[in-house]
Amino acid sequence: LALVALSLPAFAQDQTPTTLKGVLLEQLRTTHNQKDWFVPANTAVEGLTSQQASWKDGSGNHSIGQLTNHLIFWNLQSLAKFKGEQPAKFSGNNDETFNSFDAKQWNASVQQLDSVLTEWEKVVEAADDAKLQAWASTIAHIGAHNAYHVGQIIYIRKQQGWWDPEKGVK
């Protein structure tokens, strides 16, 4: 135990200092398109048909398409606020963020999810430290929210036999 304790300071000195920007970017990227601790959003929705994206279990749970649209909505809302823009009108009914899914627009939804997640990475990369300090909690929650719903998407895919385990985290 003493040997481990003595080696920690040396190990810590070899590490590049972590910055807030670095942590936030890592979280955004690993919930978008870089596999790390969990499957990212792009992998989760990759290769699904509109019919698969529309499937619901009949118990009130959301479809993959609905989950995707919910992610798009909340990422766009927060992104607009971060950029100082007016976010889309919102009635306050969170159910509406799920129920707007249109199966005919599935491929466009997949592209829009990728686009908004890419834009988040760009604006965080360009932001100064003061802006990131003010927004750190919100951005961290966005990453956690994205990971939560991506987990639901993976669960549905596994449940329905639409998941390739080779795409998972090893």
Annotate the PLM regions.
Residues 1-16:
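Bacterial Sec-dependent N-terminal signal peptides
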Residues 97-132, 137-140:
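Acidic/histidine-rich alpha-helical segments that form the ligand environment
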